[in-house]
Amino acid sequence: ETLVAKKSELSTQRAAAEKVLADLKANEAQYKQVLSEKEAAMESQQAEIVRLSRELAAQSGNTTATSGGYIWPCSSKYVTSPLGSRYTGIAGASTNHAGIDIGRVGYTTQAVAAKAGTVIISSYNKYRGNYVVVSHGSGNTTTYQHLSSRSVSVGDKVAQGQVVGITGTTGVSSGPHLHFEITENGKIVDPLKYLTNYIKGW
């Protein structure tokens, strides 16, 4: 192999490597933009949940939370992702997880109300998928996301343990699971503060 041919080969390899690097940087920038848009949308939706919960409390004259504790929102207790910052698989990027993910569920597993309350949202969006939000009074809510189907409508009063939907993988989801959130006085709290005997899967 001649020196000229070798230089030409190295030049081609360098150009290919530079293109790969440029593509990676472009993808990283695009990912950061998408992540920023998602976080902004989720914050807006969370504010709407708080508003609806407080509006319901004002209309009903009930400014105190329903009594009693929380039960598991599905039959599985296998938690695959806890509340808080988590790695997303892209270098340098993480996302703030506002609840817990419960795995080892399928497309027929029932999602049930962790506490009695009133349905304030039963809807779909591209991030949460099919989701249901139940108000328990005084700015306290529970949220059930990525459902394959929803079993309740806005305004429905649900008992603790009543089916609100069927688990699935709608919205931004890598597989069947139930994303579950609890808020108290409009603030996100760790569901594992109340849900005991969980199996750690992270």
What are these regions (language model features)?
Residues 68-202:
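Catalytic cores of peptidoglycan-degrading enzymes
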Residues 1-67:
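Alpha-helical oligomerization segments with coiled-coil/rod-like character
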